[in-house]
């Protein structure tokens, strides 16, 4: 079979209480729905995913932050370059939606109910090599280049000398390269020794 499909649904309830007189007891209902389609043919694999995020905010003693809804698509492609070796080239695009946390929205003096969600568009191009030198020893190396375009990034800034607050800062561009290696030695079926290293430049 070349096609595979998956659907998942997650629900979460969060609330915040404190002993402060200014506490309005905010709470949030979160609904996340994900639909994934995967297509495989010989050495080629493609995955498409659509995430629907719903954040319903309210307060027991006031007006909560704005409700948030977002459709976030993502796509990834992988191709095995050599039939007899695990050498893959990868490319991906992902839209990431991050709602403000309770601390960023409601924390005493620091929070802001007017925060917009943080939206990131992530582009990635990479290569992966895996090799088994014996039935006990495995090796994996990856190299990735990425670009992240962030809109309405949430950051903490000083409101005065003693108080900080959270704001959206418009657009942020992040570019970089990641390299990693992982070596594993299997002592037996239950015990493995691993050595890993990672380097990031941006």
Give the label of every model feature segment:
Residues 2-19, 25-61, 65-124, 145-167, ...:
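Surface-exposed extracellular loop regions of Gram-negative outer-membrane beta-barrel proteins
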Residues 1, 19-25, 36-38, 61-65, ...:
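Outer-membrane beta-barrel proteins
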Residues 25-31, 67-71, 119-123, 137, ...:
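Residues that define the transmembrane beta-barrel architecture of outer-membrane proteins
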Residues 76, 124-128, 180:
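Outer-membrane beta-barrel "beta-signal"
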Residues 43-44, 140-149, 167-202:
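Gram-negative outer-membrane beta-barrel transporters
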Residues 2, 42-43, 83-85, 121, ...:
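Short coil turns and loop connectors of transmembrane beta-barrels in diderm outer membranes
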């Amino acid at each position: 079979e070349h096609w595979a499909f998956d659907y998942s649904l997650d629900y979460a309830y969060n609330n915040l209480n404190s002993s402060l007189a200014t506490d309005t007891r905010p709470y949030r209902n979160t609904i996340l729905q994900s639909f994934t389609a995967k297509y495989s043919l010989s050495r080629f694999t493609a995955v498409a995913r659509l995430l629907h995020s719903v954040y319903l905010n309210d307060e027991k003693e006031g007006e909560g932050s704005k409700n948030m809804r977002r459709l976030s698509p993502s796509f990834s492609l992988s191709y095995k370059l050599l039939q007899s070796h695990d050498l893959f080239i990868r490319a991906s695009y992902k839209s990431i939606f991050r709602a403000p946390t309770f601390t960023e929205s409601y924390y005493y003096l620091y929070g802001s109910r007017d925060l917009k969600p943080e939206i990131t568009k992530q582009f990635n191009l990479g290569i992966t090599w895996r090799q088994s030198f014996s039935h006990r020893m495995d090796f994996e190396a990856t190299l990735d280049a990425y670009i992240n375009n962030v809109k309405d990034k949430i950051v903490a800034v000083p409101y005065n000398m003693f108080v900080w607050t959270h704001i959206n800062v418009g657009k942020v561009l992040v570019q970089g390269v990641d390299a990693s290696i992982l070596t594993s030695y299997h002592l037996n079926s239950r015990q493995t020794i691993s050595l890993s290293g990672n380097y990031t430049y941006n």
